[in-house]
Curated annotation (Swiss-Prot):
Enzyme class: lyase
One of the GO biological process terms: amino acid catabolic process
Function statement: Catalyzes the dehydration of D-galactonate to 2-keto-3-deoxy-D-galactonate.
Gene: dgoD
UniProt: Mg(2+) binding residues: D183, E209, E235
Protein name: D-galactonate dehydratase
Pfam families registered for this protein in UniProt: MR_MLE_C, MR_MLE_N
GO MF terms, alphabetically ordered: galactonate dehydratase activity; magnesium ion binding
Native source organism of the sequence: Xanthomonas oryzae pv. oryzae (strain PXO99A)
Listed pathway(s): Carbohydrate acid metabolism; D-galactonate degradation; D-glyceraldehyde 3-phosphate and pyruvate from D-galactonate: step 1/3
Length: 382
């Protein structure tokens, strides 16, 4: 079998899908994208095509290493996202060719179902209590929301209180019947992160995500020493080498690589294994589309330390399409009590409505994250 063609499709709300075709008629799907940089990743995908077209798709490890190492300059968000999407598609092809789900190729199941959580609120979160109430009726008991809006490097007690009051209201409304993670989203500098963690500790969040930016990873062990709240990070880390350094330094209780950013299935299986060696949980980042979610689930199902899976049904970003709109076999992704069962179909187990996707590609989205500014006019972290 040989790879013959790579085709990319843009689709609302902010996704890029990749179709990899072979001379035997088996096709694989991937989702290579950086939110807000889809066209940059698309260009990288087609640049990497020269390494894979004409090659045997079964040699996933060799193709991955070639895409990563053949260029003198390597790594980073764009290139690793392009590799990720191609890698996902190669695993999809291999599973379909052999008639088994990808998790069987990775050694088989360690669990029968994977617990997921729901996003509530938005960039500037509001109506969180009502959303949690609605989702609890659907069987979900674990949630995540943004913890702050803009926050200066050194900010006021008012800014801290605003974040804490919101969390207090949620805990008061639901008691300990729910769990929630709080996403600092890299908006908080190290000095304020320490203050916020101290004030949030009485409300027992499940985790705090991106307490500081990945560029400030040296603060993870210092912050962890000041709180009992597990710290999570990793959506803006793109290889096992970055995770290696963070895990060696300590401080992180849960790693969150993105299967569409951090080299795909091949790389993230390794990241999960390294994290397990450090007794650190694995909870892939995935506010993206169905192929990305399917890839995450296959790694979750073979990773003993997988604890939670993010998924984007109803997320505030999904304007123009929701998670399963381009999926034919929607029932395979159905959540029961907040968990998804092992996907039964060969490959990644997601059947894409290609006709719908082609129509979406005729009017491609141009999503960009908001640009925020502080009251003094300086740019703020979104």
């Amino acid at each position: 079998m040989k790879i013959t063609r790579l085709t990319t499709y843009h689709a609302a709300p902010r996704w890029l899908f990749l179709k990899v075709e072979t001379d035997e008629g088996i096709t694989g799907w991937g989702e290579p994208v950086i939110e807000g940089r889809a066209r940059s990743v698309e260009a990288a995908v087609h640049e990497l095509a020269g390494y894979v077209v004409g090659k045997d798709p079964a040699r996933i490890n060799d193709l991955w290493q070639t895409m990563y190492r053949a260029g003198f300059y390597r790594g980073g968000a764009i290139l690793m996202s392009a590799i990720a999407g191609i890698d996902q598609a190669l695993w999809d092809i291999k599973g379909k060719a052999l008639g088994v789900p990808v998790y069987e190729l990775l050694g088989g199941l360690v669990r029968d179902r994977m617990k997921t959580y729901r996003w509530v609120g938005g960039d500037r979160p509001g109506a969180i209590i009502q959303q949690i109430t609605d989702y609890r009726a659907l069987g979900f008991d674990t949630f995540k929301f943004n913890g702050t809006e803009e926050m200066k490097l050194i900010d006021s007690a008012r800014a801290v209180d605003a974040a804490v009051v919101k969390v207090a209201e949620i805990r008061e409304a639901f008691g300990n019947t729910i769990d929630f993670g709080i996403d600092f989203h890299g908006r908080v500098g190290a000095p304020m992160a320490k203050a916020l963690l101290r004030e949030l500790e009485p409300f027992k969040p499940l985790f705090v995500e991106e307490p500081v930016l990945a560029e400030q990873a040296e603060y993870y062990p210092r912050l962890a020493a000041s709180t009992s709240i597990p710290l999570a990070a990793g959506e803006r880390m793109f290889s096992r080498f970055e995770f290696k350094n963070v895990l060696c330094a300590g401080g992180i209780g849960m790693v969150q690589p993105d299967l569409s950013h951090a080299g795909g299935i091949t790389e993230c299986v390794k990241i999960a294994a390294i994290a397990e060696a450090y007794d650190v949980g694995f909870a892939p980042h995935c506010p993206l589309g169905p192929i990305a979610l399917a890839a995450c689930l296959h790694v979750d199902f073979v990773s003993h330390n997988a604890v939670l899976q993010e998924q984007s049904i109803g997320i505030h970003y999904n304007e123009g399409a929701d998670l399963l709109d381009y999926v034919i076999n929607k029932d395979d992704f159905h959540c029961v009590d907040g968990s998804i069962a092992a996907l039964p179909k060969p490959g990644l187990g997601v059947e894409i409505d290609e006709d719908m996707l082609k129509r979406a590609n005729e009017n491609p989205p141009d999503w960009r994250n908001p640009v925020w500014r502080h009251s003094d006019g300086s740019i703020a972290e979104w």
